[in-house]
Amino acid sequence: LTDSASTANPSDSPAAPGFERLMYASLCTVKTSVFDEMQRIRAHALKRNVADDVHVALLYQSGWFVEWMEGPSKGVHAVMARVARDTRHRQIRLLHSSHGRRRLSEPWSMAITQTQELPTDFARRVMEMREHHRLGQELDPAAVWRRLSTPLTHPGAREQALNDHFQRVIVVSAHGTDSFDLVRWLGQSQEAEVVHRRFAGSRDDMLDVATDYVDVDTGAVVRRVIAMARNGLQIGLTQAFLSDYSHAVLLLSGDAERDHQLMVRMVAACEQQPRRPVLLGVGSPACKHAELRRLAHKGGLVYLDCERGADDGVAAVWAATEPALDLSLATQSGWPGVGGSGWDRLSGT
């Protein structure tokens, strides 16, 4: 299965370790609500894909679908055979094929990205990634996903696979929408586009969640700052990218119980990650940093506290956060994340 709908199996490498990982893009033919249709796809996938032990993430953006799947070869091929017969899309393009660890931690995740791009803009990136695949220049599946979903107008859009050119930071607030307020403020102050997305996972008892991001060119690197809803930490697609983040910024509320619950969620989300972001706890002097640090260390995470003073405005929050992010650029050795970042030594863990 390469450039058109076909039931032929992708090439297999029995000697390669881990799960088979495939990614394709296709033109969406859905004429009604795409989100509603993706929910119907989800209901079907949770029955069929689970039986095949295949984990899947589905993206809709600019008139295109992108599907990332991981699992045993037999199961992946069974899913692709069903994909080839599905009339909700056409012009299937295989963009990635490899064997390796499974990044997607749950059977189903999906994302809808809102941008001003035309389908032809997205198509150019699809053709670029198709050519990389044809030439055997395989990137990690997460890097392919980022390359496809990053608008070409963003700084460094074509260099998403180069970690030394990028710093990726996730921001989650213990209460309210502070993380989204911060990203919106960064977009306004830096005159940079804020990209709005919705994520959903496998759980029936959890609604879809918002996640926004902004790409800011600092000169030294392009810094992507991602606002994530608290519930979003439980979604497989969110967890698939955690090992690529240098830091997770926790915007603390000063309410000990809320801050505790946020830390518990973050530790759980990072539990299976081979590399983990450094945690920055940003809050007032009243925050219980010692307890949060204890929880982080128990979960194998580095925790640094960043006090913002009495001012809780977004400018003050960023003023407390940015120096720690900048310092990591000077001390990095194999970041993102813990496992070579140098932060483990700086924090005494």
Where do the protein language model's features map onto the residues?
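Hydrophobic beta-strand residues in large extracellular and virion-surface proteins
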Residues: 169-171, 250, 279-280
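Conserved C-terminal guanine-recognition region of P-loop GTPase G domains, centered on the G4
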Residues: 254-299
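Inter-motif core of Ras-like GTPase G domains
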Residues: 234-256, 266-272
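Charge-rich, low-complexity N-terminal segments
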Residues: 2-221, 225-244, 260, 297-305, ...
